[in-house]
Amino acid sequence: MNRILFAGLSSGSGKTAVTCACLRALQKKGISAASFKCGPDYIDPMFHQRVLGIPGENLDLFFADAKTLQRQIACYEQRCKIAVLEGVMGYYDGLGGVSDRDSTWDVACATNTPVILVVRPKGASLTIAAQVRGMLSFRKRNQLAGILLNGCSESMARLLAPMLEEQTGLPVVGFLPYVEDASFESRHLGLVTAQEVGALSEKVDRLADAFLQHVDLEQVLRIAATADSVAETVKSEAALKSPDCPDSPQFPAPDKQCLRIGIAQDTAFCFYYEENKRALRQQGLELVEFSPMEDKKLPEGICGLYLGGGYPELHAGKLSENSGMRHAIFEAVRHGMPTIAECGGFLYLQKELEDPDGQIWEMTGVLDGRGFRTNRLQRFGYAVMTAKENSMLFEKGESIPVHEFHYWDCTQNGTAFEMKKPVGNRTWEGSVAGNSLYAGFPHLYFLAEPRLAERFARAAAKWQEKQREKAL
């Protein structure tokens, strides 16, 4: 499958804007594309999803191995002509900021994807060539295949392009100028969600028009066509009829009746890995969306709950005022309905939650803690989570890679797991786990351990059977 990866010298290079512009430009040209985000960020794929109209996915080597990433890409070969990957942070920045492991470069090598380096030439010219040459020589295998100038005027691009090509040997595929009123706003969790960006479609259209005018799309496609083929063994393992890959070994096709799972989906709860949703569907689970902010009761006939991350702290007042939903969730969890609550969902299960103005609001009360605001990220980044006891999703001693990204903390974070940073010796306890509940700040990634989805489905089936027995 043809593919291209947009990477940067650092965060703030404009990778997201360039990636979205490219995706929409491809769409305008009638070229079907799949989108992927390097690393654990679940916000950028939401932008990709809005642009493409199909789900975006993550490619993360801390969560999964190279073969799994290749399989993810292979799943889209029948439907799409090209995969567009967006990098994370600086190109070589990996674990702990001191390693290239799990970096954008690592993903590029693992997936054999050519890379276009997005460079913002602000206050520099020849120095950019020195930086790029350093990038080229830093690792023997670098995957770098081109340069795109971002936030650059046409006159500056005409000056820089020939110099950069001469000094680096890489082609400059074009430039993306500053497009007025087409920037993405900021929020404490990186970027605002796709649902909240004002006139996102119009913004991306303007970026795409600029991309088509100033970037040589044909050259980008030629570079993408140099990508090495995904191994035939990987292709054969992936079900290429659908991006859901139902026959993939990662998601064994279950022979089960469909069970309904309520999944919180609104502006307060919207952070989910598409791969997690797919894993649950592969286990015979129908994901039924509901809004903890707007709906007064849970969906009918559900056998489990999935409360994802998001911004409940920004909507604490409205969540609190919806007492019908708060009570419904309290009763469901109290009576043993299988429940997964991650980050924002974990805060919603607490007794109280502080909003950005310092006001305290009543939440569901499933747990006895209070969520409160801090002035910096808490336990940010990757960790390895090891179960201290058996529970719905885990057996004692099992470990799984996870990720945390949150400014809010909690008075009671749980003690069911031993947490450890992959770099350094920092450890702590976290998350709550029981026979029918997982709740904690860490985001789970089901590709890292497919048995999590299997066990959740098994718990949902047992719950349904129990309810049927009660009804007899």
Language-model segments: residues:
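Phosphate-binding active sites in nucleotide-utilizing proteins
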Residues: 249, 259-323, 327-332
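Acyltransferase
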Residues: 195-240, 244-255, 265-269, 430, ...
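Beta-strand->loop->alpha-helix junctions that form or flank phosphate-binding loops
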Residues: 37, 172-180, 286-294
